[in-house]
Swiss-Prot record:
One of its GO terms (cellular component) is plasma membrane. The lineage of its organism: Bacteria, Pseudomonadati, Pseudomonadota, Gammaproteobacteria, Pasteurellales. It comes from Aggregatibacter aphrophilus (strain NJ8700) (Haemophilus aphrophilus). Its main location: membrane. This is UPF0756 membrane protein NT05HA_0561. Pfam families: DUF441. The chain crosses the membrane at residues 1-21, 52-72, 81-101, 128-148.
Amino acid sequence: MSLQFNMIALLLVILILLGIFSHNSSITISAAVLLIMQQTLLAKYIPYLEKYGLSIGIVILTIGVLSPLVSGKIQLPGLSAFVSWKMFVAIAVGVFVAWLAGKGVPLMGEQPVLVTGLVIGTIIGVSFLGGIPVGPLIAAGILAVLIGKF
């Protein structure tokens, strides 16, 4: 088996480097796993990953979000906390962000090359504006709204 040098492999290497530079381990690990899969006999499993990967990832993310509640690190607030204006704003922001992420999923599927632009933007924001890396679904959702793909 020999290494395949193609544009996809080059893109994955660029994403790995951008992920390392921006301290975005999600991008680094994801691109590295896909590059290894592409370059080995694991390539036959890429269609399964393409079909089910996003759904599995969302389930794992949801488990991660809910686990502090189950472990007791976060307590459910009392009923009075739900009627405060801050709680209403928090719920509205949560709904809005979930809606944005939902808009990002189709965009990432239709135009996956835009993920590279999102990573470059993340690097600039982290490096020069003191930002932190955020999820690509929300960034893609914002992009989808801005370019009219919703």
